[in-house]
A protein has these predicted regions:
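Active-site-proximal, well-structured secondary-structure segments within enzyme catalytic domains
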Residues: 171, 175, 207, 214, ...
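Short His/Asp/Glu-rich catalytic/ion-coordination signatures at enzyme active sites or charged loops
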Residues: 52-67, 116-135, 158-200, 259-299, ...
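Bacterial N-terminal signal peptides
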Residues: 15-28
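Signal peptide processing junction and immediate N-terminal pro/mature segment
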Residues: 28-36
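Bacterial N-terminal signal peptides that target proteins for export
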Residues: 2-18
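N-terminal helix-rich structural modules
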Residues: 36-242, 668
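Short pre-active-site segment immediately N-terminal to the catalytic Zn-binding motif
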Residues: 489-508
Length: 719
């Protein structure tokens, strides 16, 4: 199917969507490859034909590591052959012999890649890691070979140009317009000479993105805080001290080491009593990639911004953000920037109130100094403890994993959408802890398969995410096979798995993604389920989070695992109220990073190479976000999301999706809350539609108007 051709490997992590772009501009990545070519691909390979298991799910019990590479390589070859046949079809281009044919293409590759994508992240081993390194650049080259296929694009353009007279239904018309846009965005409309220019820009961009990552990793390692004086770490728990000692041993150092997280603020600053230590750690974080040494990233990122602007100009856009947002819900950088700008006044006003409260606390303790960013976390933690503190050991007995799943996650899905769940212990899994459920619609009709892989393992990537083994498509006759992965602590044998409320929220969040995939009801796989823009894809998952703290749902699952008694009201109230604590600060740092991202990516190609420090300061001042005690969540010099991880001109998407989900939950509250009528309407008008129509129009039609920022501000406690 066409969405595979412009390929991206998606990994959803704790509420965010991290997208590793393997397609456009990575053809130059086909360098040295140490992995041996795959062996012969034949009927003995489990991916040779469609699975005979229910829902065509993957036969994990029959797959050897080597089967993945053989099937992926055969799938690539088959896909290129299929595309070549479409591009060179002697018949005149039609919707059926071009677009429908493309949607049918690549099924072998999809079967193999989707399964490999799962195990390489959730249950990897050295052989799978070698295959990953080998296949990533080959997948990129495959995408380029299709994106820039001149004959194929000529057929696509011919149909696009006459689309209004073809009598296409709405979904088919959407497919034509969307995929034409994707090919144009990839450079298919360029002359051969300009395609070569684009390739060179892409190659340099890819190289510099890797350079940025390499420099930043080295900078973070060089600026970790190391000490042999235990007194400087006063305030850390024994567990934290033990972890710091282990970190020192790993680096063959004496004493203790506190490694840098990639955010500006560091977790340990909330506990360290010594102000000089806090200051030193903050400075290490703030200046980590600005030392004027080999690890300094400023020249690299400035050139990256310039390259992206030049690429956008070549493709006919005024700036990179304008190019990148053409297929997003926001559509234009002006819309994204206007949205962020509107959130700044209320957010910074709340941060100012919080700062005054913290300064009062500092003064009451005889501090004798003015609040600085390295003080915020320490004193905010004292306020949090006083107002909202609860011991995790008090809370966890009320959040037993199976109970949360069945009486919380499944209960909410049943009340809203009529779903029921039956565990399928007869189906193979990729690891013994994985569970499989068949999901049924209200009338008992099979809807999907859903896997959950919840426990931490050494060979599993961190975080939490959702993805699919099989996507829904009426054209292909497939129903969804979806999975959620997390990293909860595994209990000792015979003991219950007890969760924090953050873990509970993660379960609801990832299941929201799963519902989006399971409810898909579309003809074409390229438009199905979660195949939607970044600033929309987190909306269904974040919306589903709300049910974790909904009073009716919470009371149903928050019960002691031994006695069945409900959580005491006072403790439950603390959990709910703590959600809005310190949100002026937290949201200000997010807005600052989001605005910085867009400021870098609205630069025109004619702009001179910018000095990152000057540019950053001036940008924050223009946005009224140059606040001494609230630094950006990421400084430009270590903003990994936008210089390496594919979030350039897209970091705003987290907050945009939050606006959508808060408006949606407000609508539910205004219309009776947790009811089947509300759930069914939301499912049929939003969750089932995938990318089959303009998402803004679709959302507005369901909501009954355009979303506003007011519910978002309310949910964060900012008004």
């Amino acid at each position: 199917m066409l969405q595979t051709f412009i390929h991206s490997a998606k990994r959803r992590v704790s509420g965010s969507t991290i997208v590793f772009l393997l397609g456009i501009g990575a053809a130059g990545a086909c360098g040295a490859q140490t992995q041996k070519a795959a062996g012969t691909f034949g009927p003995s390979n489990p991916f040779y034909g469609p699975s005979t298991l229910p829902f065509q799910t993957t036969p994990f019990n029959k797959i050897k590591d080597s089967d993945y590479q053989a099937a992926i390589d055969a799938g690539m070859a088959q896909q290129l052959k299929e595309v070549d046949a479409i591009a060179n079809n002697p018949a005149a281009p039609t919707f059926k012999n071009t677009f429908v044919a493309l949607e049918r293409a690549g099924q072998l590759y999809d079967r193999a890649w989707n399964a490999f994508n799962l195990v390489s992240q959730a249950n990897t081993d050295p052989e799978l890691e070698k295959i990953q390194d080998y296949e990533a650049p080959r997948t990129a080259a495959l995408a380029d070979a299709i994106n820039l296929n001149t004959k194929l694009f000529a057929r696509i353009k011919a149909i696009y140009d006459q689309r209004a007279s073809l009598g296409l239904d709405a979904e088919s018309l959407r497919l034509v317009e969307y995929q034409y846009q994707q090919f144009v965005k990839a450079g298919a409309n360029l002359s051969d000479a300009d395609k070569e220019k684009l390739k060179k820009l892409d190659e340099e961009e890819s190289t510099l993105e890797n350079t940025f990552m390499t420099k930043l990793l080295a900078a973070a390692a060089a600026d970790q805080y190391s000490t042999t004086d235990r007194t400087t770490l006063a305030g850390l728990s024994e567990g934290q001290m033990d972890a710091a000692a282990e970190e020192a041993k790993a680096h063959k150092l004496q004493g203790w080491v506190l490694p840098l997280q990639n955010t500006t603020q560091q977790p340990d600053l909330a506990f360290l009593k010594d102000r000089a230590t806090r200051h030193a750690i903050f400075e290490n974080s703030w200046k980590r990639a600005e030392r004027g040494d080999a690890n300094d990233t400023r020249a690299t990122l400035a050139r990256l911004a310039q390259l992206r602007a030049q690429k956008a100009a070549l493709l006919g856009y005024p700036n990179y953000a304008a190019w990148n947002l053409t297929d997003q819900m926001a559509k234009t950088p002006e819309a994204a920037i206007g949205f962020l700008d509107a959130l700044v006044p209320a957010t910074t006003a709340k941060a100012a109130v919080e700062a005054k409260d913290i300064q009062v606390l500092i003064d009451s303790q005889g501090g004798g100094f003015t609040l600085e960013p390295w003080d915020w976390e320490f004193y905010a933690e004292q306020v949090r403890k006083e107002k909202y503190d609860y011991d995790e050991s008090q809370v966890k007995p009320y959040f037993e994993l199976n109970n949360v799943l069945e009486k919380g996650v499944f209960y909410a899905a049943h009340e809203l959408y009529g779903l029921t769940f039956k565990e399928r212990k007869d189906l193979p899994v990729w690891q013994a802890d994985v569970r499989v459920f068949e999901v049924y619609d209200a009338g008992g009709k099979p809807l999907a398969l859903w896997y959950c892989d919840y426990f931490k393992r050494d060979n599993k990537n961190g975080g939490a995410w959702e993805d699919s083994l099989v996507g829904q498509s009426k054209l292909l006759g497939t129903l969804p096979v979806v999975y959620n992965v997390a990293n909860f602590e595994k209990p000792a044998p015979g003991q219950p798995a007890l969760l924090s409320f953050d873990d509970v929220t993660t379960m609801f969040h990832e299941f929201g993604h799963a519902l989006h995939a399971m409810f898909a009801d579309t003809e074409y796989p390229s438009l199905s389920g979660t195949a939607v823009p970044r600033d929309f894809v987190e909306f269904p998952s974040q919306f589903n989070e709300h049910w974790a703290s909904n009073p009716t749902v919470f009371a149903h699952y928050a019960r002691h695992y031994k006695t069945g008694e409900p959580m005491p009201a006072e403790l439950a109230a603390k959990i709910v109220k703590a959600k809005t604590f310190d949100q002026g600060y937290a949201f200000t740092e997010i807005l600052a990073a989001s605005e910085l991202d867009l400021e870098w990516h609205v630069l025109p190609a004619t702009a001179p190479l910018e000095n990152p420090d000057t540019f950053e300061q001036e940008a924050l001042e223009r946005k009224h976000l140059a606040i001494s005690y609230v630094p950006p969540r990421y400084r430009s010099s270590y903003f990994l999301h936008i210089w390496n991880e594919g979030y350039q001109a897209g970091y705003y998407a987290y907050t945009w999706s939050e606006m959508l989900d808060d408006n949606a939950y407000q609508w539910f509250e205004d219309h009776g809350g947790l009811t089947r009528a509300n759930g069914d309407g939301f499912r049929h008008m939003v969750l089932s539609r995938g990318n089959t129509e303009d998402l803004q129009k679709m959302y507005d039609a369901w909501l009954g108007g355009e979303p506003t920022i007011e519910p978002l501000l309310k949910n964060r406690g900012l008004k």
